[in-house]
């Protein structure tokens, strides 16, 4: 069975209650299914908190964090360090054998600078599946942070939705993007069950989909096109529905290729 990549985002990493719900759902799913799982995460909320403590500015451009040279080491520490190891500690509490990685490990993705005006922000593309396949076949749960490394050895902050997309391409995996919201909402605040590229463009033009959600929707559309299969955007808040989601039941918005 092809692997399933679960991308974690939003305030989930900052909430013990949310992490307890998520890992309880993961344990329940793993007990019933032999499907290999990979977790991909960012940690924007943790980075924002750290920047505030250090009195450093937080600048975002089109939903992407501007990452100057004097901030990339701090962001790497927050994402590949604190956020990643927090998730490993929760896995350990739930007797899940996890391995903490970044996008650069085993050349699992190829990362290049996205746009000079954004600083050390990278774009990830599919790389080698060898390391991840070795870990998955041995029963490990890879937990991958969205820090990448270029061919020149530069650390890059990669949008976690886009990072998860690249890893899904690497592994030929299905992809679920978990966030704070229950899916994509229309102008009346109602969840949209299915979304096409045409519908997304229409809602962006109308100003209904904005900022970080534009990045998320575009990443999901890119993934759906690249993988040739739907991608789900859903909330981690409904823990009782997560095992069904992991089994292919749409509980949020299903992005169609």
Swiss-Prot record:
Superkingdom of this protein's organism: Bacteria
Cellular compartments annotated: Cytoplasm
GO cellular component: cytoplasm
Residues noted as binding ATP in the record, renumbered to the chain: 180-185, 208-210
Chain positions of site Transition state stabilizer: 7, 216
UniProt GO molecular function: acetylglutamate kinase activity; ATP binding
Cited InterPro entries: AceGlu_kinase-like_sf, AcgluKinase_fam, ArgB, Asp/Glu/Uridylate_kinase, NAGK-NC
Pathway stated in the Swiss-Prot or TrEMBL entry: Amino-acid biosynthesis; L-arginine biosynthesis; N(2)-acetyl-L-ornithine from L-glutamate: step 2/4
Assembly information from the UniProt record: Homodimer.
Similarity-based family: Belongs to the acetylglutamate kinase family. ArgB subfamily.
Stated name of the protein: Acetylglutamate kinase
Record lineage: Bacteria, Pseudomonadati, Pseudomonadota, Gammaproteobacteria, Enterobacterales
């Amino acid at each position: 069975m092809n692997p399933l990549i679960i991308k974690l985002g939003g305030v989930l990493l900052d909430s013990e209650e949310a992490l307890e719900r998520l890992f309880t759902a993961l344990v329940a799913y793993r007990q019933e299914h032999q499907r290999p799982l990979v977790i991909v995460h960012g940690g924007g909320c943790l980075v924002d908190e750290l920047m505030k403590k250090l009195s450093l500015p937080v600048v975002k451009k089109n939903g992407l964090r501007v990452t100057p040279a004097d901030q990339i080491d701090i962001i790497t520490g927050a994402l590949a360090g604190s956020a990643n190891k927090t998730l490993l500690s929760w896995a350990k509490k739930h007797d899940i054998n996890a391995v903490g990685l970044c996008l650069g490990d085993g050349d699992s993705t190829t990362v290049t600078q996205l746009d000079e005006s954004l600083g050390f922000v990278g774009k990830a593309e599919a790389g080698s599946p060898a390391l991840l396949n070795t870990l998955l076949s041995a029963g490990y749960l890879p937990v991958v942070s969205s820090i990448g490394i270029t061919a020149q050895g530069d650390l890059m902050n990669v949008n976690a939705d886009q990072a998860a997309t690249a890893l899904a391409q690497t592994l030929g995996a299905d992809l679920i993007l978990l966030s704070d919201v229950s899916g994509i909402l229309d102008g009346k605040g109602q969840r949209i069950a299915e979304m096409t590229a045409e519908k997304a463009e229409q809602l962006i033009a109308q100003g209904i989909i904005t900022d970080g959600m534009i990045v998320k929707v575009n990443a999901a559309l890119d993934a759906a096109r690249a993988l040739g299969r739907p991608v789900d955007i859903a909330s981690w808040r409904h823990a009782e529905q997560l095992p069904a989601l992991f089994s292919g039941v749409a509980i949020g918005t299903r992005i169609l290729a």
